[in-house]
Amino acid sequence: MSVSCWEFNAG
């Protein structure tokens, strides 16, 4: 996986 929960939260 390239994105994580924190990556999604930033969006």
UniProtKB/Swiss-Prot annotation:
Stated induction or repression of this protein's expression: A fusion of the 5' UTR and initial codons of the gene with lacZ allows expression of beta-galactosidase, suggesting this protein is expressed (at protein level).
General remark: The start codon of yoaM overlaps with the start codon of nrdB on the other strand.
Protein name: Protein YoaM
Organism expressing this protein natively: Escherichia coli (strain K12)
